[in-house]
């Protein structure tokens, strides 16, 4: 459950390390974002000399949440951290690598490029 003011780790090599959510997109009028939802975020911590700088406003997709996900099979899954991948306007990731596992629900929401870059899909 990601809401405005939530801090997230960045799961790619775009140059940002920490994001703060400022708006949840694509969730209707809901206050919370879940895996596969797009968010507008501000970069709070970044690696020097990279494409993404501190205080940049970026669009990202949530790939991991500490809040559990219930699947149709009855299984629940949760991750150790809240994480997002920075994307461009076309929905493609700005980085060239994705770190850590991502949820299978991203494939259903047409983020296949992120799923293909991830080392593990749960």
Curated annotation (Swiss-Prot):
Binds to 23S rRNA. Forms part of two intersubunit bridges in the 70S ribosome. Part of the 50S ribosomal subunit. Forms a cluster with proteins L3 and L19. In the 70S ribosome, L14 and L19 interact and together make contacts with the 16S rRNA in bridges B5 and B8. HAMAP family: Ribosomal_uL14. CDD domains: Ribosomal_uL14. It holds the Pfam family Ribosomal_L14. Keywords: Ribonucleoprotein, Ribosomal protein, RNA-binding, rRNA-binding. The keyword rRNA-binding applies. This is Large ribosomal subunit protein uL14. Belongs to the universal ribosomal protein uL14 family. GO terms for molecular function: large ribosomal subunit rRNA binding; structural constituent of ribosome. GO terms for cellular component: cytosolic large ribosomal subunit. The keyword Cell inner membrane does not apply. GO terms for biological process: translation. It comes from Nostoc sp. (strain PCC 7120 / SAG 25.82 / UTEX 2576).
């Amino acid at each position: 459950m990601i809401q405005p003011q939530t801090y997230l780790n960045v799961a790619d090599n775009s140059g940002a390390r920490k994001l703060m959510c400022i708006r949840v997109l694509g969730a209707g009028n809901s206050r919370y974002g879940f895996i596969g939802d797009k968010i507008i975020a501000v970069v709070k911590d970044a690696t020097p000399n990279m494409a993404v700088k501190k205080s940049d406003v970026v669009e990202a997709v949530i790939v991991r949440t500490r809040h559990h996900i219930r699947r149709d099979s009855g299984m629940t899954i949760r991750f150790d951290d809240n994480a997002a991948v920075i994307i461009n306007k076309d929905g493609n990731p700005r980085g060239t690598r994705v770190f850590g596992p991502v949820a299978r629900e991203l494939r259903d929401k047409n983020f296949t490029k992120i799923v293909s870059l991830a080392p593990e899909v749960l």
